[in-house]
Design a protein with these regions (language model features):
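Basic, Lys/Arg-enriched alpha-helical interface segments
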Residues: 1-67, 76-80, 87-120
Length: 120
């Protein structure tokens, strides 16, 4: 079974700013997420601390020796929603900056699918 993967506009903006090589590295990990879904664990996926959402995870990508992260959640329909990404090299505050950002994006996403009647 393949798991559904969706992405937000914010993720897409980040993705479009990546080089082709960076996109390839991230795409490999997204492919693993598509294949294994919520069963994918460390070292590829880890739980994010400090999120308002207990199901907030990070996709852990290494590219050219640098750590990239994609924050995502499985929504109530069990689709993986890619929220935001970034290269955390040299940024000790990456999680402090990106987790609240991803929380806001996911809140807005949930409201949108609720309004469309896709979830109760």
């Amino acid at each position: 079974m393949e798991w559904e993967i969706e992405f937000t506009d914010e993720f897409n903006v980040w993705w479009e700013g990546l080089s082709e090589a960076e996109q390839d590295s991230v795409a490999v990990k997204i492919g693993l997420l598509r294949a294994h879904g919520p069963n994918l664990g460390r070292p590829t996926v880890d739980t994010v601390r400090g999120s308002r959402h207990a199901n907030m995870k990070e996709l852990r990508v290494q590219h050219a020796g640098e750590p990239y992260r994609v924050l995502f959640c499985f929504d109530p329909r069990r689709a993986a929603i890619l929220l935001a990404g970034g290269n955390k090299t040299g940024n000790d505050r990456w999680y402090e900056e990106f987790v609240p950002f991803a929380d806001r994006i996911y809140d807005e996403y949930l409201e949108e699918i609720r309004t469309k009647g896709l979830i109760p």
